[in-house]
Structures are given as C-alpha cells and as structure tokens.
Amino acid sequence: MLDNKKEYLKDAMFIRDMAMQHEQLFRESIPLIASENIMSPLAMEMLLTDLGFRYAEGLPHHRYYQGNEYVDVIEDKTTELGKRLFNSKTFDPRPLSGTNANMAVLYALTEPGDKISVPPLSGGGHISAAKFGAVGFRGLKTVQYPFDINEMNIDIDGTIKTIKNERPKVCWFGQSVFLFPTPLKELQDAFNEVNARVVYDGAHVAGLIAGGEFQDPLREGAEIITGSTHKTLPGPQHGMIIGNTDDDTWKKVQRGVFPGTLSNHHLNAMAALGVTLAEELDFGRDYAKQIVKNARHLGEKLYEFGFNVLGEKNGFTRSHTLAVDVSKNGGGRKVAENLEKSGIILNKNLLPWDDNKNSQNPSGIRIGVQEITRIGFMEDDVTELAEILRDAVINEKPVNEIRRRALELKSRFNNIEYCYGNMKPYSYIKIFE
C-alpha cells in the first residue's frame, strides 16, 4: 500500500551499510576490549524474536499487561538457571545493564545523604560508583578505599581503617580494571562492626565467578552481586542482580528494578541471557579456565618482551584483564589509536597514579582476552599476539605490516566456541531483501 514511500530509503540503507562495515571491522580485527564479548548463535536468535516488541511490567504471573503467558515461563526459567549457575538464593534477570542493576540496588539499600564506600576510579573503580555516576545520582556521600599499587588491589589495612572510621551504610566493591579478587574475607570483621551492607559489582568477572576461576563473593561476605551480562559472561548487553539476602531486602531490590529504575525489561535480551546461562552451565568452567590461562600467559609474554605490565608480583592477573603502563611509549591514547589502525582494538585506561582529569590521555591501556578466547585462541596464539603487540608498540614497525600479521592471525579463528551449535563470528545476519 505504501510501497511508493521510499524518500528516505537511502538513509536507512546507509545505516545498514555502516552496520555491515562495522561487522567487517571486527571480522578483520583482534578484539581486546575487556568489557565486550560475542554471543552464541542461539542467544543471537533470541534477539530477533517478537519478544523484542513486547512489554512485561512487574513480576511473572503478576503482570500489568496481557500476552505474557510464554514470557513468564521464559523469565522463570532464566531465573532458575541464574540461581543454579551462581548458587544463589535469588536472581533477577530484568535490569537493562550493569549500571541499571547498580541503580536498582542503591535505590533499595540507601537514602539520599547516606554514606557509601567505593573503590577509587584510578584504581579501576567503575563510573557508576563515582560521584558523577549512579552513586552521585542517588545523592550519596562517597568515601574511597586506599589502593595498593604493588598489589593492584585495595589496601586491606587501609580499607579496614576507612570502614571503621567512616562507618558507611554500604560497602561497594568491584572494578572495571579487575585484576585480582577483592579481599572480602579479610574485611568481614569491619563490615560486621559497622553493620554495613556489602555489594559486589561483578560485571567484569561474572563468567569467571560462575566458572569457579575467580572468587565466590556470596560465600566470602557479599550480600548482593550486580553485573552486566556481556563480558566474561558472554551474553547480551543486559543486566542481572544476584542475592543471598533476606526476603524483605530482596523485595526492595525487586521494587528498585521495577518500578524504581525501569518499566519494560527488553524481553528478547532476557531470553538471550537465559540461553547464555544454560550454555555457561554446560561450557562455562572450561571457558573461564582458558580465559585465565590466556590472560596470565599474555601478561608473562608482554612482560618478557619489555612491556610494563602491572601486577607482576601476583602473576599479572587472576582474571581476563591486563593493565599495561605505556607512558614511555607515547601514552594510552596514542598506543590505542595506533593499534586500532593496525587491526587491534583495545582501550586507553587510567592507572592508579593518574589524575582522573587525564582520562582522555592516561598512562595505560587495558587488555581483555575473553573475546579472543571465545573464538578459540589458546596459549600459543596468545604468544603470537604478544609478538605482534611488541612489534607494534615497542619496535614501532609499520602499521601495514602489523595489520597484515594481525589479520592473518585473526583469520584462523572461524567459529564461536563454548556454546551450542556453530557459527562463523562477526557474520552479518541479513533479513531484509
């Protein structure tokens, strides 16, 4: 009826073309962003369903909309899988992101004017725990934990002193440069003394927690875990809240999600999360183990080749992430931009001694291996990657040479691993003809 309405088709096709070029960019590049991953084919399929067009306000079987018969079953199953994977009493698959999950928990546990203790931004703390993020938006007063650069972790004695002196209502943990487990057990007496609620932002390490390769926050003193679902947990860009808390607190958390911080919860992404949780129960331990092997091996090789890899005292990392000081190589911005031109995608990053004002040109870069592990990289492949990084950053070999080598390395990996089915990664899924 409206077939003649094509005045702006060229604009729509332009956007499609840019999306296809984006897919090609990642098909021909080595992805090392620590906060990204690639989904399985079955999880991707969920994003294309009619679920993405529907609403389901409220909790399963108590909705404000009709048409949720199958949505309720999907949400119940996703919740069941989440509780099983994380061995938790409760699980909420509705948050739209990790920050949304954080906001919901802050809404539940705090009032404006309350005090919260958080990791410092330059020590890897996430922006949602900063004054200009969700914490500030809630009107909370922040106090930061001291950071031990040699340990690349919060300073235990200093943090105990901070908690006892400042008496925060909530002690918040978790980082976006998360190299080593948080010493929750060592801080437990301090939590108890001031009667603080303990929340652990596990966005970056959720897949490692689920796979038994990092720490178990709920057994080490945390009451609630928040997180996104698309980093070491290789699902959709979505969020989750995991808890072993009392029923009254959990009801507040659920109200913090809806109606507190969202209306609809993107049902297609929730279904994709459910598929991802099932795959993690089957494949997650092997995946997490290889992630940590690859990260530690890459750290060792980069250090051997002359990079200033932080955390050397403790084996560089216990997670998927490495932090590297490249201040002698032009700084984080220059190195990240040059590597992007060479077909290697990572990000510049603040290091503990950097001023937060220098976030656009910090000392460091952040490297994550979870996505290359997802497509099949093993230790020998990581060694070759380290050689390419050395020649690009330290030896400053021509961009064209580095790009050729990076593309050749990447071209060997043509399947998404640790999941059901087979699919070539970075394939554009075409529906419109």
Curated annotation (Swiss-Prot):
PROSITE patterns assigned to the protein according to its UniProt record, in alphabetical order: SHMT
UniProt main location, coarse: cytoplasm
Keyword Amino-acid biosynthesis: yes
A cellular component annotation (GO) from this entry: cytoplasm
Modification N6-(pyridoxal phosphate)lysine occurs at: K231
Keywords, in A-Z order: Amino-acid biosynthesis, Cytoplasm, One-carbon metabolism, Pyridoxal phosphate, Transferase
Domain of life: Archaea
Localization in the cell: Cytoplasm
Site (Plays an important role in substrate specificity): H230
GO terms under biological process: glycine biosynthetic process from serine; tetrahydrofolate interconversion
UniProt cofactor(s): pyridoxal 5'-phosphate
UniProt: (6S)-5,6,7,8-tetrahydrofolate binding residues: L121, G125, H126, I127
GO MF term list: glycine hydroxymethyltransferase activity; pyridoxal phosphate binding
Spans traversing the lipid bilayer: none
Pfam families the record matches: SHMT
Known EC number: 2.1.2.-
InterPro entries: PyrdxlP-dep_Trfase, PyrdxlP-dep_Trfase_major, PyrdxlP-dep_Trfase_small, Ser_HO-MeTrfase, Ser_HO-MeTrfase-like, Ser_HO-MeTrfase_PLP_BS, SHMT-like_dom
Pathway assignment: Amino-acid biosynthesis; glycine biosynthesis; glycine from L-serine: step 1/1
Family membership noted in the UniProt record: Belongs to the SHMT family.
The protein's role, per its UniProt record: Catalyzes the reversible interconversion of serine and glycine with a modified folate serving as the one-carbon carrier. Also exhibits a pteridine-independent aldolase activity toward beta-hydroxyamino acids, producing glycine and aldehydes, via a retro-aldol mechanism.
Subunit structure: Homodimer.
The protein's name in its UniProt record: Serine hydroxymethyltransferase
Annotated source species: Picrophilus torridus (strain ATCC 700027 / DSM 9790 / JCM 10055 / NBRC 100828 / KAW 2/3)
Classification of source organism: Archaea, Methanobacteriati, Thermoplasmatota, Thermoplasmata, Thermoplasmatales
Name of the coding gene: glyA
